[in-house]
Amino acid sequence: MASTTGALILAAGKGTRMHSDKPKVLQTILGEPMLRFVMDALAPVFGDRVWTVVGHRADMIYAAFAGEDARFVVQEQQLGTGHALQMAWESLRAAGLDRVVVVNGDTPLLATETIDFFLKESAEADIAFMTLTLPDPGAYGRVVRHNGHVAAIVEAKDYDEALYGPEPSEINTGIYALRLDAVESLLPRLTNANRSGEYYITDLVGLAVAGRMNVLGIQCGEDPNLLGVNNPAELIRSEALLRTRLVIGHIEGGVLIHAPETVRISPRATIEPGAEIYGPCEIYGTSRIARGAVVHSHCWLRNAEVESGSEVKSFSHLEGATVGKGCSVGPFARLRPGAVLDEEARVGNFVEMKKARLHKGAKAGHLTYLGDADVGAGANIGAGTITCNYDGKNKHRTVIGAGAFIGSNTALVAPVTVGDGSLVGAGSVITKDVPEASLAIARGRQTNLPRKPKA
């Protein structure tokens, strides 16, 4: 793609029909904001030459894409799509663009291949836009043609058969290709003389036709992938289509997915050929499942890594965690951000880890909390062990040495260290460091007293 072509995403609207406090483009699909799907479709074609117009709750959009190389333009007042283009014009010109493709931020089904096709078909046009023919055009803008040639785009609420003739079934998808030199003279001529009182980008078409510019309406049949998402029902339908598309792609790539209709996978997740997934299961964010790893049913993963030969058993919850090779997790385990399992480590049922590391071969079989902890290779953590890491103000670390054995129902009050090869007796409350190769017992002596007989 020529370096003088860029893209503009319109994402400033409120999306009132979503009945949500957050902007429409941040509604989630497969754990990701809807806007991300549009950005991902454009990136292979335009690289970093993509701008997004934001307005309503722009702060939330900035936060959602913090740390990413996204370019934003602010539309302080949401006065329509034409006004949004005007707000972005200086940025587009400063980037040295000759052409710009304009898309709406609520089209998560948009495919890269569609954009490639559109650019080739519109190469000679001053203004081009994509159209669909629908049995029920609904609220979409109508495409008016005279003798097959585009005459105008008229918004549904403004359509007047006395002026334009019988209402057509061909609609505007909201995807445009604009030659900047041609459009620059038209932008100041946009008006808000319509029922919405907004400046429509669609009015550029009528102005261009009147100016005898080359205007093309490129027909794309009845492709539903080009339609926007306007309400919760449409969001759910789009998510279902995207879920199926992604799951099928992984299966065709060599991933074994059982009950695929119940599996949800983020577009940013990586699942290597030879991995095995059992549904229902949810894999979100930048999670990575390596070849030979198995994730069982009813698991939830976000930004987690599972290396080859590892098994995540049912009902486990992993977020921001790393599971090394040959590990076992669960069932019913929770690995929170910063949890790391080195090779052949094991975490069993009802074990929670946070900012904690189990080195090679270490294991915590059940009913344990390991927070802000480092557990040495081969250590064994007994049932009911708790690292008491919070003193009410600050978090503190617990270090358990290689080969150590922590007896059941032990409380390790951080900061504290248990040395290599040491044993802590069951039921202990450890508040002081335990030297290497030591036995530590910190509990009250058992007393047996005679029991009074019942009266």
UniProtKB/Swiss-Prot annotation:
GO biological process terms held by the UniProt record: cell morphogenesis; cell wall organization; lipid A biosynthetic process; peptidoglycan biosynthetic process; regulation of cell shape; UDP-N-acetylglucosamine biosynthetic process
Any single GO CC term annotated in Swiss-Prot or TrEMBL for this entry: cytoplasm
Binding site for Mg(2+): 106, 230
A molecular-function term among this protein's GO annotations: magnesium ion binding
Subcellular location: Cytoplasm
Pathway assignment: Nucleotide-sugar biosynthesis; UDP-N-acetyl-alpha-D-glucosamine biosynthesis; N-acetyl-alpha-D-glucosamine 1-phosphate from alpha-D-glucosamine 6-phosphate (route II): step 2/2; Nucleotide-sugar biosynthesis; UDP-N-acetyl-alpha-D-glucosamine biosynthesis; UDP-N-acetyl-alpha-D-glucosamine from N-acetyl-alpha-D-glucosamine 1-phosphate: step 1/1; Bacterial outer membrane biogenesis; LPS lipid A biosynthesis
Region (Pyrophosphorylase): 1-232
Active site: 366 (proton acceptor)
Positions with a binding annotation for acetyl-CoA: 383, 389-390, 408, 426, 443
Cofactor: Mg(2+)
Region described as Linker: 233-253
Main subcellular localisation: cytoplasm
Pfam family, one: Hexapep
Protein name: Bifunctional protein GlmU
Organism: Nitratidesulfovibrio vulgaris (strain DP4) (Desulfovibrio vulgaris)
Gene assigned in the entry: glmU
